[in-house]
Amino acid sequence: DSAPRAALLGHSHMDTAWLWPTAETVRKNARTIANQLSLMEQYPEYRFLQSASCHTAWMQREYPALFERMREAVAQGRYEMSRKTDGNQAARCGWNATAIWWAARR
């Protein structure tokens, strides 16, 4: 099918330790991810886009069970990772470029 497609993704912008301690960012991030995974259970068509790879590393270290749930959702194509491009680079899709999350491939 060559028809154009569009998708809506859930997204939560989580500043990394902006005006609060890093430990609070880790906790808030875990709660946000857990909520997104719960939404995926409720709504099979729901997709989520995460925009900070350091948050993934924190989940792997601090919340391993949650990290495994994230990996499962990535493998299902329901949880996407994004990274911000360098502000000096021209990105065709704007300031965010979708990247492949390595953990889904392991």
Language-model segment annotations:
Residues D1-R106:
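Carbohydrate-active enzymes and regulators
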